[in-house]
From Swiss-Prot:
Keyword Ligase part of the UniProt annotation: yes
Keyword Magnesium: no
Catalytic activity: tRNA(Pro) + L-proline + ATP = L-prolyl-tRNA(Pro) + AMP + diphosphate
Name of the protein: Proline--tRNA ligase
Function: Catalyzes the attachment of proline to tRNA(Pro) in a two-step reaction: proline is first activated by ATP to form Pro-AMP and then transferred to the acceptor end of tRNA(Pro). As ProRS can inadvertently accommodate and process non-cognate amino acids such as alanine and cysteine, to avoid such errors it has two additional distinct editing activities against alanine. One activity is designated as 'pretransfer' editing and involves the tRNA(Pro)-independent hydrolysis of activated Ala-AMP.
GO MF annotation terms: aminoacyl-tRNA deacylase activity; ATP binding; catalytic activity, acting on a protein; proline-tRNA ligase activity; transferase activity
GO CC term (a single one): cytosol
InterPro entries recorded: aa-tRNA-synt_IIb, aa-tRNA-synth_II, aa-tRNA-synth_II/BPL/LPL, Anticodon-bd, Anticodon-bd_dom_sf, Pro-tRNA-ligase_IIa, Pro-tRNA-synth_IIa_bac-type, Pro-tRNA-Synthase_IIa_type1
Free-text comment on this protein's domains from its UniProt entry: Consists of three domains: the N-terminal catalytic domain, the editing domain and the C-terminal anticodon-binding domain.
Biological process according to GO: prolyl-tRNA aminoacylation
Upper taxonomic lineage: Bacteria, Bacillati, Bacillota, Clostridia, Eubacteriales
Family designation: Belongs to the class-II aminoacyl-tRNA synthetase family. ProS type 1 subfamily.
Quaternary organization: Homodimer.
Amino acid sequence: MKLSNMLVSTLREVPAEAEIPSHKLMLRAGMMRKMASGVYNFMPFGLRVIKKIEDIVREEMDNAGAQEFLASALLPSELWKESGRWDVFGPEMFRLQDRNNREFCLGPTHEEVFTDIARNEINSYKQLPLNLYQIQTKYRDERRPRFGLMRSREFIMKDAYSFDKDYEDLDVSYKKMYEAYHNIFIRCGLECNCVEADSGAMGGAGSAEFMVKSEVGEDEIAFCDSCGYGANIEKAPAISEKFDQEELKELAKIETPNVKTIDQLIKFLEINPAKLVKTLIYKVDDKVVAVAIRGDREANEIKIINALGGAVNFEMADEETIKKATNSEVGFAGPIGIKVDCLLIDEEVTNMYNFIIGANETGYHYKNANYKRDFEGIVGDYRKVIQGDKCPLCGGNIEIARGIEVGHIFKLGTKYSESMGANFLDEKGESRPLVMGCYGIGVSRTMAAAIEQNHDENGIVWPLSIAPYHVIVVPVITKDEEQMKAAEEIYNKLKSMGVEVLLDDRAERPGVKFKDADLIGIPIRVTVGKKIKEGKVEYKLRKEEDLEILNIEQVYDKVREEFEKSSLKL
């Protein structure tokens, strides 16, 4: 394509709304434009990248034996009520009514739809295994859309669903998808790690995320520096610290006037926070729940919600609720005699001796409290792992990093097939529920993640495989007939080789052309300037600082080499 005939919408200034590199660069490079909060139009360059990623996804899914189809984005509420998720998804679901007052939603995910198709189309084990996938726009009413494509209200996603006769076959399907995802992200030029994950509202027995390490990632990941274990911090098990056994001392109430926070209590009593147990109070749907954890630990709300069997609304309790539960002012909650629907005790607390707790009385705490002797509750892992915790596999040290989730795979099991009656007849003629898997890739988020990993101060540095165009040919002076003739010859030759190539034939200053090429991130730049009189041109890779002076014929060989390095065919 010739740039003089294209919509080139580059910006020199960073839009005020953009916070992270990918968001800034996609707007500046003219990849997309904002329509509303969390809603974007893909411009020509951006759409080409999306299509490249989609093509890679399709190839790998097809190679893994999956079949593509397209489901409706407008979904009737009956399916969601049948699965029990109409209320579980909460306010993130876009809900609407038609003119006959029938309820619908814009699909945030498609488990129910695929299950409905399966129960209507699959009736025998002879039709299994089956894997269906689609690439489609999803909709979620995010409370606070931010970071461009990282957290938007509509996003392009590939979702696949496998149907098997038993869990052994599900393991096979799951492994195929794992390998396909591994291939997809390598081909997209991403450095990606697979980590254990929470299944969230999707449900199911097993789950893993494909995470791109990035400082701007919204997820925290726990990694082992010894064995390579990785898990989303929502899922990572916290290994309890072991304490030296102590003789149990007598429980005693102590006066702590005007002490309402952990920091104030530490200073007042001059103690280590590891000798404190704090009691956090939450409102979970229509219940009040208290969680007792060590004073210097942070509660893991996902673990708490999972322990309670899920929740639509989960929030810290308000002052009135706390006063009713403790008969005291805020700041003195403790596990002894607290009036709540459920008391959860972090496992680490059960290993502690003679610790400090709130007394549920204004101005007082207890010292020398001990689990079992003084209080009991539902014991479990309710805290977040931290840097330096022990790995659950090898005992090595855990490190915490931030990451961007680009893919997620689930072993759903029979959660949806049982609730929606998706059954098949097995070899014995007996009816059994289909065993399902779910596999999602954020296509638009993958685009953003690729930029986060591949950019510099001048713009995007696209991997060759997903770049909007492979090569840009830049004549320095378009009015120079010799330069333009050579540039067009190179342009046409590269096109004939199957290279996706741009010719910057705009009547712009050379500096503007170079800045646009770098900003948009075209992997290879061929510059035709004064040296064309000697049959020479400049050849430069976007990812490298240095350039080479080559004969024109050498350019074609260099381009072929670059394709081979990226495992791309011409």
